[in-house]
Amino acid sequence: MNNLRYWIWFTQAIGYCTTKAKQLTFLYNSIEEFYLGGESEWRLSGLFNNKEIEKMSKIPLDISDEIIGKCITYFYDTVCIDSPEYPKCLFDIDDPPAVLYISGALPDIDDRMSIAVIGTRKASMYGIKSSYNMAYQLSKAGVTIISGGALGVDCSSHLGTLAADGVTICVLGCGINYDYLRENAKMRSDITFKGAVISEYPPDTEPKSYHFPQRNRIISALSDGILVIEAGSRSGSLITVNSALEQDASKKIFALAGPVDSHFDGSNKLIKNKVATMVTDYKDIIDAFDNVYVTTELDVSAQPSDDVIDVIPIKGKPPENINGLKTYDLSEVPQHKENLNLSEDEKSVYYAINYEPVHIDKISEITNLPVFKILPIITTLELRGLIKCVQGRSYRLI
């Protein structure tokens, strides 16, 4: 606890995503020794410029006390960079976090196979379904799933792991006590029963745009391999891949091949350029580590059904708990979303569909549009996550 106080002070003065915390662990017996050395010692270390030394001089040590009090009040755990419990795989990167704030219990990440499942927040239904199923299957094989707790691919991979009664780590780009994406609050709570929600930022820290690239280095460091589910050419997932390869050039990168369209430009390019290994099945990932980890045999009879997509949260709707999973009471959700920026034909097709399956011939009858015009519109609505195909050529709202 004593070291914690000094490490929190250090982060408040110097910030996050810095190489200097790790360097201090080699130069001093403790962070307390460094602090007590004062300005003269800080200069002698050769690590800090005048502006940083001035800031350390002005930041009082008791700035840490409120943060520690918050952790005690909400039963959050903390692990400092110089603690024996600090993950070795995280310490090994150039800029490991000085402090990790933890809700739940951090799994033994160094001795258990872990895969980061990443992708776009605006995932297609193919991406949502694939991330859920891959996380489910990998979890059944004993793999820890790591992701970022965002909407889309992150959320569905966490939920797939929970459905498999597996272990998952959610790495946030804000404080673990901040009400980030309220609709995912129940999911984050469920994660803590067998895994952990973690952050390098103090509990009440608001998310900033630059936090997420910083967060990505933690996701990549904690994982043995990275699975890219769906990424466009400018996706943040590519930042995670780059971070992983900068940390360890031999890090295994996997990607799910997708349609030849903008949603999968980044994923397909990783495969084309041989940065990532193409995967079509969870076993492709397991086999890549067969000389490193022993995994459990997957119970094939326990495969998730197509209905799993119904439990993926919708932005802005508070979650409920149904059979241990997170879903939404669709009876309370307006049948059709507003302000979707659809063309007139797209609106006609969208409003012809409801929560009961509607055949494409019926849609044609309602809209007075020929089927050949409806088909590309259907594809657009599916990619935007507004509808899904449920049987044959029938569709329903999501």
Tell me what each language-model feature is:
Residues 3, 80-398:
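Glycine-biased, small-residue-rich flexible motifs in mid-sequence functional cores and linkers
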Residues 1-129, 133-140:
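Short, positively charged patches
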